[in-house]
Amino acid sequence: LTFGECCELYIQDCKARNLRAATISHYRSSYKQIYKYFSPDMPIDELTVNKYNSYVIYLKEHLSNDVSINAYLRDLITTLHYLMDNEYMPTFKMQSIKVDKMVKETYTDAELKLLLKKPNINKCTFIEFEAWVITCLLFSTGIRQHSLIELKVKDIDFDNLILNVRVTKTRKPLLIPLNVSMINILKVF
C-alpha cells in the first residue's frame, strides 16, 4: 500500500465512524500539506521513525508557528496510529513538539463595555441589533459558533430560563441556564 492509499483508508474509517464532514475535510486539507513532504506514492512501509523525525524538522524549518506545526503532526500521528493499530505498518513512537504557552490577549473592561453596550433600538439597523444580541448570547453561554447558527426559537425556554443547544461539537445536547437579563434581550429580539 502507498501512503496516499493509507490516508484514504483512514478517511474511509472516519466516514464509517460518522465523523463530521468538516473533520474529514480538515484531514484532506492537512494531507495536501503532508504530501508536500511524503509522496502519496511512497510505500507505507518506508515511513519510519527517522522519516517522521525528518518531517518534524522540515516543518520547523518551513513553518514559524509551533501551533501550526503541531496541527499537522497531530493529524499525521492520528492517521499513523490508525495504520499501526490495523497492522498496515510497523509501530513506532511519535510525539508532537513542545510549545510555549502564550498568554491570550483578552478584552479590556472598556472594550467589553463598548462591545456589550445596548444599541439604541430606534437608531440602529436590525443587523446591528442582531449582532449585539448574538454577542451577548455568546458571552452569556459560551456556546460555539456552529451551535449558535443551529439555534431555533423553540430552543429557548423562556419560562424556565433554559437554552436547549441541540447541535454541539460532541453531538450531546446541552441545557444551558440563561440569566434574566439574557432572557429579556432574547424576548425583545
Predicted regions and their residues:
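Short, basic/aromatic-rich helical patch in the C-terminal catalytic core of site-specific tyrosine
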Residues: 76, 134, 148
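Short, cationic motifs built from Arg/Lys/His that form the positively charged side of catalytic pockets
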Residues: 71, 77, 130, 143-144, ...
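Short functional hotspots where side chains directly engage DNA or cofactors
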Residues: 160-166
